[in-house]
């Protein structure tokens, strides 16, 4: 079905893709074909090692897709909407081939070892102006509560030292802060941003921190400005609200997994 759809869209193109679009198309097509071929072989041979290695080939695909979408939005695929849509459909279906190959590898591993499909790990990034309180606390809470299904990080526009009181509060709840400052938003690489599933602004909208969001990532604004109390009470108030919101978020994005 994917091959038929790709072929149907390809014949709609007035000219073959060129430049960056052509390069990315070749890369993704090669990856999809190789993964599918190896996945089928792994399944037929009941080769769990080959299946595991093949699954790893899918890791760069999400990053490459962001480069593809950026190139398309930048005009490298032309401005004709019909052509843009056709190219988008082609890339999307190649990505689905990669996904199906990965699924087949997971079935192979289960058949050979009895190991169930690994839970998908969602990457969540919290943003705060100075990163002195809310963002590092949200990161610590997320990694404590959802360590099997979430990978949480934090960044700040103008990183300041994390409040000592916040560090002590988290320590009293069994959570250690591995650094004294958040990473700077300016230091986030394109790959780091592209790997995020959700980016959350805690004291301002995400677009005040990140001008260009990755194509597939979701931006949320929690606007936690009204944390009440002082000292321990302030940290407790933030802790309770962040814990509830993080649990609700993970429940929403994981669905029935």
Annotated model-derived regions:
Residues 131, 170, 199-200, 242:
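Conserved small-residue
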Residues 209-257:
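Phosphate-binding/catalytic loops
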Residues 1-125:
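Cytosolic, long alpha-helical scaffolding segments
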Residues 114-115, 143, 186-191, 208-212:
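Short, flexible, glycine/charge-rich loop motifs used to bind or transfer phosphoryl groups or to couple energy/partner
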């Amino acid at each position: 079905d994917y091959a038929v759809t790709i072929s149907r869209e390809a014949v709609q193109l007035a000219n073959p893709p060129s430049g960056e679009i052509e390069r990315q198309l070749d890369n993704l097509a090669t990856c999809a074909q190789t993964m599918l071929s190896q996945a089928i072989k792994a399944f037929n041979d009941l080769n769990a090692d080959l299946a595991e290695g093949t699954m790893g080939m899918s890791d760069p695909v999400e990053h490459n897709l962001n480069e593809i979408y950026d190139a398309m939005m930048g005009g490298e695929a032309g401005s004709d909407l019909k052509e843009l849509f056709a190219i988008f459909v082609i890339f999307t279906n190649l990505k689905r081939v990669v996904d199906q190959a990965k699924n087949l590898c997971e079935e192979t591993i289960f058949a050979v070892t009895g190991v169930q499909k690994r839970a998908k790990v969602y990457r969540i990034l919290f943003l705060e102006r100075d990163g002195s309180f809310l963002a590092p606390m949200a990161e610590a809470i997320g990694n404590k509560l959802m360590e099997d299904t979430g990978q949480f990080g934090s960044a700040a526009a103008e990183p300041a030292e994390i409040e000592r009181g916040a560090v002590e509060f988290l320590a009293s709840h069994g959570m250690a802060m591995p650094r004294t400052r958040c990473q700077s938003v300016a230091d986030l690489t394109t790959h780091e941003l592209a790997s995020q599933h959700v980016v959350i602004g805690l004291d301002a909208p995400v677009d005040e921190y990140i001008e260009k969001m990755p194509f597939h990532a979701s931006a949320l604004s929690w606007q936690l400005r009204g944390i009440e109390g002082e000292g321990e009470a302030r940290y407790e108030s933030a802790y309770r609200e962040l814990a509830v919101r993080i649990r609700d978020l993970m429940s929403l994005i994981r669905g029935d997994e």
